Regions:
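Surface-exposed amphipathic alpha-helices with a cationic face
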Residues: 14, 97-104
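Active-site/ligand-binding-proximal alpha/beta "capping" segment
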Residues: 43-90, 96-99, 144, 156-174
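Active-site-proximal loop->helix
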Residues: 1-39, 119-139
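Generic beta-sheet signal
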Residues: 23, 50, 110-112
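Short glycine/serine/threonine-rich phosphate/pyrophosphate-binding segments
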Residues: 1, 6-10, 86-97, 176-181
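Acidic, glycine-rich active-site loops and adjacent beta-strand->loop/helix elements
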Residues: 3-7, 26-27, 87-91, 113-118, ...
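Active-site/ligand-binding loops adjacent to catalytic centers
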Residues: 33, 43-44, 101-175
Length: 181
């Protein structure tokens, strides 16, 4: 993982028994991917690239997407205008989007990325403060054909929204949720 990965993530992995190898922070996620692939090849291990492995969106085609379809069907299609999904690996938005679009075109799919790193929207990419989104490139798992629009979220606005939810509802939103608020 990049040497600047969140400390809590590193601590959690270590507690689970992982051995962590760091790639330079400046090389970002792609540097970590290269290091993981090289390490796997050198040791005869299988490298499961979460950004290019169809098992990722397939899970969301089989589980998350159908659960959302059932929920919308229960409430009525007119009750939901859009589903907003933060894009990191592209697996969730692709799997859910494909499932929803196979069922109906009446529900829009919005993909969220950091304003400061707009690879999906074709803009400039760069550093930002939203963990697990906006890697600076379009992940292989991302299916643009199921996305109706891409929304860029400013890091500061995402953090403020998370703080507001925590203060008003006493809910600590996860990293992906912060971006869709």
């Amino acid at each position: 993982m990049p040497e600047d990965a969140p400390a809590l993530r590193q601590e959690t992995l270590l507690r689970l028994g992982a051995q962590i190898r760091h790639s330079p922070a400046r090389s970002g996620v792609n540097g970590a991917r290269r290091l993981a692939a090289q390490t796997a090849a050198a040791n005869g291990w299988y490298y499961m690239d979460w950004l290019a492995n169809d098992d990722n969106p397939e899970y969301h085609r089989r589980v998350t997407g159908p659960a959302i379809v059932q929920s919308i069907a229960r409430e009525g299609k007119s009750a939901v205008d859009a589903i907003v999904i933060g894009v990191g690996s592209g697996g969730t938005v692709t799997g859910v989007g494909e499932t929803i679009k196979a069922w109906t075109n009446d529900v829009r799919i919005a993909a969220v990325e950091p304003y400061e790193s707009q690879a999906l929207g074709g803009g400039l990419t760069g550093p930002h403060g939203i963990s697990d989104l906006g890697y600076g490139f379009v992940p292989e798992n991302f299916n643009a054909y199921v996305v109706d629009n891409v929304v860029a979220v400013n890091t500061t606005d995402a953090q403020r929204a998370a703080q507001k939810v925590l203060r008003t509802l006493a809910i600590l939103p996860g990293r992906q949720i912060v971006n869709t608020l």
